[in-house]
Regions:
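Polar-ligand-bearing catalytic/cofactor-coordination segments
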Residues: 1-24, 36-37, 43-45, 50-194, ...
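Hydrophobic, membrane-inserted alpha-helices
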Residues: 27-31
């Protein structure tokens, strides 16, 4: 079973970094087309500098942004003693600092991890998750989230969110500028460049979204594997995933920007079954359970 779960872990990490590199190439390509069309290299420099600034901002404030969007509130050990002690024990086993714990008042069972590194990590769970799962299942979910922290998934996931938004915004600006100012260039070369630019600007957000979804699905499978290794009881996480998937109602506060951070789609299990796998933020539950149980 262990070999079945962990064989592709290192391969998935390599592929993820390749996808991240592709994101930066998209940004540079957009800036290049725009700078070439207007004959100004400063536009490309602006794109590069602005993308770096956005990534720095996301690094320092990612946890605050995500927690604000989710409506999570920090709790004390006395308020949720069992939850706190389970996470505390797993953190010791994983060799990680104890993350801060946040709770979301929502009946939909779900959880996520955020923060810029293991020393500034946060694990958030819904009240529905706490009431639905038994201790071994809760350990499985928390082990999954700690694996995101240990695997440094949180920062990568946040950067993906920022880059998808950045590519979409710049593509929109690029498309509008080419359409409204395309008449200024009547020569054949200018028209060809405008056509290429418009096609690229329209398609790049779509490909950026696909990259975001691909990274999310790979990271979830990796965290499942690492979480099972941490608890040494993959059946606990498998049972938890099955219970979570059977809850069909969406979360009260959900944002597509952070949907991929959750252990399950916040839109609910019913919605997830109706959309195609290509646009799903998470791998199919059946696939995840099969991988865990071997």
């Amino acid at each position: 079973m262990a070999q079945n779960i962990y064989t592709n872990v290192s391969k998935n990490i390599t592929k993820t970094w390749m996808l991240m590199a592709l994101f930066f190439c998209l940004i540079i390509a957009l800036g290049y087309f725009l700078s070439l069309y207007y004959g100004s290299a400063n536009i490309l420099y602006f794109f590069v500098i602005f993308s770096i600034l956005m990534n720095l901002t996301s690094y320092w404030f990612s946890d605050k942004i995500v927690l604000a969007l989710s409506g999570a509130k920090e709790i004390k050990k006395s308020e949720y003693f069992d939850l706190y002690t389970v996470l505390e024990n797993l953190s010791i086993v994983a060799g990680l600092p104890m993350p801060r714990i946040y709770v979301i008042e929502d009946l939909a069972p779900n959880a996520f991890a955020t923060g810029r590194d293991k020393n500034h990590a946060v694990v958030a769970v819904t009240t529905g998750l706490i009431s639905l799962l038994d201790r071994s299942e809760l350990e499985g979910v928390l082990g999954h989230e700690l694996s995101h922290i240990g695997n440094r998934d949180m920062l990568l996931s946040t950067v993906v969110v920022v880059l998808v938004g950045f590519v979409s915004i710049i593509s929109d600006i690029f498309t509008r500028s080419l359409i409204f100012h395309g008449g200024d260039r009547d020569h054949k070369g200018g028209n060809v460049l405008m056509l290429i630019g418009i096609i690229f600007a329209i398609l790049s957000p779509f490909f950026a979204l696909l990259i975001q979804l691909a990274i999310s699905r790979k990271r979830e499978l990796l965290a499942d594997a690492s979480g099972a290794l941490l608890t040494r009881y993959p059946e606990g996480l498998a049972r938890a995933l099955k219970k979570i998937s059977q809850y069909s109602r969406p979360m009260i506060r959900q944002s597509s920007a952070i949907a991929h951070l959750y252990i399950a789609d916040p839109k609910g299990g019913g919605f997830g079954k109706r959309i195609t796998g290509l646009f799903a933020t998470h791998p199919p539950v059946e696939q995840r359970i099969k991988a865990l149980m071997g």
